[in-house]
A protein has these predicted regions:
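Low-complexity, acidic/polar, glycine-enriched regions of mature
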Residues: 20-193
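N-terminal export signals
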Residues: 5-21
Length: 193
């Protein structure tokens, strides 16, 4: 009797559908763009920082289990103004020579309306910049490619937006010319790996 019970349990376990695991994603041909916005002497200036590495995992069955671990190459940060770019990478701001990478690691996904990563969704995480780690929150959107089938999650578009104070990370240089508040807008084209 014990043997039959054991076999029945074994077959029941085999019959259960496998639990879905998070799917790894990589950057697609469109890559990722991190755009930052800051105020320099009263005018808005935009710059970009390229993504160095991205380890992304999305779990369609449990979106709150999705994760992101992304680095940006601070040495390649750019603005439209050469003097602003050099000041940005200087020791008193990003100190690119000593801290060549920034890193974001997600800690929590909070879903928006309808249980989706859009419509009010946020991603919390830790941002390390200049060797200083602080918690940050981004408004998050995750979409299928336009024209794709409803169940086609092979190619997705991601957008994250947030704001923060550069002084929280010790980037205090040129405070007489550059406001403390910085906006961040990240757009990424990702593909299932």
């Amino acid at each position: 009797m014990h043997r039959r019970h054991f076999l029945a349990l074994g077959f029941a376990a085999l019959a259960r559908p496998a639990l879905a695991a998070p799917t790894p994603y990589r950057l697609g041909p469109g890559g990722a763009t991190i755009t930052y916005l800051f105020t320099l002497n009263g005018g808005e200036v935009k710059g970009t920082v390229p993504v160095g590495r991205a380890n992304l995992r999305i779990d369609p069955g449990n979106l709150t289990a999705s994760t992101a671990d992304v680095t940006a190459d601070i040495r390649r940060a750019r603005t439209g103004l050469i003097f602003a770019t050099e000041a940005l990478k200087s020791a008193s701001v990003l100190h690119a020579d000593r801290f060549p990478e920034a890193r974001f690691t997600s800690t929590r996904v909070i879903l928006g309306a309808g249980g989706r990563i859009s419509g009010g969704a946020t991603i919390d995480g830790n941002l390390t910049l200049r060797g200083v780690t602080r918690p940050v929150r981004f408004a998050a959107e995750l979409f299928r490619k336009r024209g794709s089938a409803p169940d086609d999650l092979s190619a997705l578009d991601v957008r994250l937006q947030g704001r923060g104070n550069r002084s929280d990370f010790g980037a205090i240089g040129y405070a007489d010319l550059v406001e403390d508040r910085v906006g961040i807008d990240i757009r990424a084209d990702i593909l299932a790996a």
